[in-house]
Swiss-Prot record:
Sulfate binds at Q206, R208, A306. One of its GO terms (biological process) is sulfate assimilation, phosphoadenylyl sulfate reduction by phosphoadenylyl-sulfate reductase (thioredoxin). The gene is MET3. This is Sulfate adenylyltransferase. Homohexamer. Dimer of trimers. ATP binds at Q206, T207, R208, N209, G302, R303, D304, H305, V344. Its EC number is 2.7.7.4.
């Protein structure tokens, strides 16, 4: 099957290649009001500029926004086969605060700036400035629950006004990591031609997690189900994913390693700079359209695709097959075929994986390790069996997810009274007597104000003693499991409400508190 036509019929690569025109835009950019992009906006801009979001040529104006929210369609681009607006399920918007919105008018041109290095990336010509109904957007697009990560971002972080308009691209956002693997839609289509895959089927596998043996098995089976000459694109997200996910550096190292475990010529890897919304069925449709633009004709969609877990009622935000059902509804408008994700399980007696729907689990012994179990094994240093993951992959995961005995921690001590200082010295002396490589560092009050620095020290494996009257920001950075909070007794202002370990301190129990903290650290596996 030939490489599919991009969504909307044309790949929209918006970065100006003409040198004189680019120089003209750079000069103009120096005279224009500047808007520094957020991390999410930066991801969105990159995929607008490189064509990953084709047919979009800018951030949505008000008419397109309303149509996408209510009908999953653009109003400005029509589907030639049915005359309806072209499918587009996720609103791609440039949010700003009210003050910024009042500085601009329709017809103005503004330059969009990279937050990391202040590089001018694009010039936007404003078509509309509007205040969206955020509650309606939350309800229609992400089902309304306040605990949905996209709704939390929408209602608590995003600006209250949107600016829509066409873009002229000056530069792509600059990346310094895994540059060869960050292929644009144009580059990936060219690679498929070079590999000789252009007339053959290609199935894309989306992931935001590390890959293990089961993932290799299911992707190979998906390719085999499509046909003898099908190939695999491992296309992980390295933009913004779900809070708490394993960092993309660790994951990319895993993907590169597992790629070597596929038969020669079967699979390739490319990284997608997408800011996920964890939008379930709508997001699955969005992912499929994006893969069409990247030149893929098949896409694996699994149970609860792009779902963020449980809602505020303790129930999954999305049904297990909502994504597959929505994609089936619009099948005749897609240039990509959906491959249902087939769960596989390990058969210990036969030393092989098999689709779970092909075996009788009452008669055949199976084995599996859940994500929670894997995290616990990494935390405790317990063995991760080779049937589950390759030793090379486990080694990578252990390097960035060491067992508790090698992890750092922060002890946050209320320093509103001298007793906090006494405890800091006592703890540093006590903990330094234990064997091991962990350093015990005591910060001063000025250093303690920088929660980022504390977080980096903990990541590096240090035990950090922090004098502070406001532990919450540090707990949020370090994480509950690696934080201890010591309050002055009867001081109600100190409780963070977040840390796993909280201790009270009074004049007569300094030694007792030291013993409590040491025992807690031992119970948690730090010693």
């Amino acid at each position: 099957m030939p490489i599919p036509t991009p969504h909307g019929g044309k790949l929209r690569d918006l970065v100006i290649r003409d040198a004189p025109l680019k120089q003209q835009l750079l000069q103009e950019a120096k005279t224009l009001p500047a808007l520094t992009l957020t991390a999410r906006q930066l991801c969105d801009l990159e995929l607008i500029l490189n064509g990953g979001f084709s047919p979009l040529t800018g951030f949505l104006n008000q008419e397109d926004y309303n149509s996408v929210v209510n009908d999953l369609r653009l109003s400005s681009v029509k589907n030639e086969s049915n005359g309806k607006g072209l499918l587009w399920p996720i609103p791609i918007t440039l949010d700003v605060d009210e003050t910024t919105s009042k500085k601009h008018s329709v017809g103005d041109r503004i330059v969009l700036i990279d937050l990391r290095d202040e590089t001018p990336l694009a010039i936007l010509t404003i078509e509309s400035i509007y205040k969206p109904d955020k509650k309606l957007e939350a309800e229609k697009v992400f089902r309304g629950d306040s605990e949905h990560p996209a709704n939390k971002y929408l209602l608590e972080t995003a600006g209250d006004y949107y600016i829509g308009g066409e873009l002229q691209g000056i530069n792509y956002p600059k990346h310094y990591d895994y540059v060869d693997a960050r292929k644009t839609p144009t580059e990936l289509r060219q690679e498929f031609e070079k590999l000789g895959w252009a007339q053959e089927n290609i199935v894309a596998f989306q992931t935001r997690n590390p890959m293990h043996r089961a993932h290799r098995e299911l992707t190979i089976r998906a390719a085999q189900d499509i046909g003898d000459k099908a190939h695999i694109l491992i296309h992980p997200v390295v933009g913004l994913t779900k809070p708490g996910d394993i960092d993309h550096h660790t994951r990319v190292k895993v993907y590169k390693q597992i790629l070597t475990k596929f038969p020669d010529g079967l699979a390739t890897l490319s990284l997608l700079p997408l800011a996920m919304r964890m939008g379930g069925d709508r997001e699955a449709l969005w992912h499929a359209l994006i893969r069409t633009n990247y030149g893929v004709d098949h896409f694996i969609v699994g149970r609860d695709h792009a779902g963020p877990g449980k809602n505020s009622q303790g129930v999954d935000f999305y049904g297990p097959y909502d994504a597959q059902e929505l994609l089936a509804k619009y099948d005749d408008e897609l240039n990509i075929k959906i491959v249902p994700f087939r769960m596989v399980t390990y058969l210990p007696d036969e030393d092989r994986y098999a689709p779970i729907d092909t075996i009788d689990v009452k008669k055949v012994r199976t084995a599996n390790i859940s994500g929670t179990e894997l995290r616990n094994k990494l935390k405790t240093g317990d063995e991760i069996p080779s049937w589950f993951s390759y030793p090379e992959v486990v080694k990578i995961l252990r390097e960035t997810n060491p067992p508790r005995s090698k992890q750092g921690f922060a002890i946050l001590i209320d320093n509103s009274h001298k007793l906090g200082d006494y405890l800091s010295f006592a703890l540093q002396s006590t903990l330094n007597q234990f064997s091991g490589e962990r350093r015990i560092t005591k910060l001063n009050a000025h250093q303690a104000n920088d929660s980022f620095i504390v977080g980096e020290l903990v990541k590096a494996g240090s035990g950090v003693i922090v004098p502070t009257t406001n532990p919450t920001p540090i707990v949020n950075v370090v994480g509950n499991g690696n934080s201890l909070v010591v309050n002055q007794k009867n001081n109600n202002n100190q409780a963070s409400g977040n840390a796993d370990g909280e201790f009270n301190l009074s004049n007569d129990d300094l030694v007792a508190v030291v013993d409590e903290i040491v025992n807690y650290l031992k119970d948690q596996g730090f010693y």
